[in-house]
Amino acid sequence: NSPKEIADKTFLYLHTSYPEKGGWDIEEGILSNNLSGKVLCTYVCRGCSHWSPSKYRGPIKRCQKCGQRSAFMPNVGHGLSIEELIKVYNLFDLYVQYAICEGFGMPQVEAACCGVPVAAVNYSAMEDVVKHTNGYPIKVQKMFRELNTNAERAYPSNEHLAEIIETHFSKDEKFREQKSKDVRQGT
């Protein structure tokens, strides 16, 4: 697979939405960067509780099951069951935790328990999680001090993540299946 072929098959999957005052505006970021065709989301219906993955259709979309315009991205107040969450993780070929810092991140461990290889920034608690899940550590590009918290944070290397993705998906299916087994057994 060439880098272009890999990029054409690569999607960002957003499972949850955490709206916060002064925080990220997910819709604005997706639309302003012309990414709506490359972003997949989990939507769950307020009416019938049916969930499904879908290309990004805005904060609310029509439910595939009941037809009502009431499906939204799950959040801490209205999420999925453990069994449904396992099905979401099993949609992934690679879980990427691309954060400037992170406490102990359950999503990384959950993904690894489902046999999904993890790539995470080699900093903070992510460093230990990626090490113990036989994952891919993403190099830190540079450190900075966050003004609001006065804490040190890490900018991940975009180039190194691209190399990880290219390397992982350039391997044959047999290698990726074995990697999945190794990740699951090591978690």
Describe each PLM feature range.
Residues 1-7:
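Short hydrophobic signal-anchor/transmembrane segments that target glycosyltransferases
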Residues 23-87:
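Nucleotide-activated donor-binding/catalytic signature segment of Leloir-type glycosyltransferases, i.e.
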Residues 84-85, 107, 114:
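Conserved sugar-transfer catalytic core signal across GT-A, GT-B, and GT-C glycosyltransferases
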Residues 90-92, 110-116, 121-122, 131-133:
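Conserved donor-binding/catalytic loop of nucleotide-activated donor transferases
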Residues 100:
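Aromatic "clamp/platform" in nucleotide-sugar-dependent glycosyltransferases that forms part
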Residues 105-108, 126:
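Short glycine/serine-rich donor-binding loops of glycosyltransferases
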Residues 167, 174-187:
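A short, well-ordered alpha-helix in the C-terminal region of glycosyltransferases
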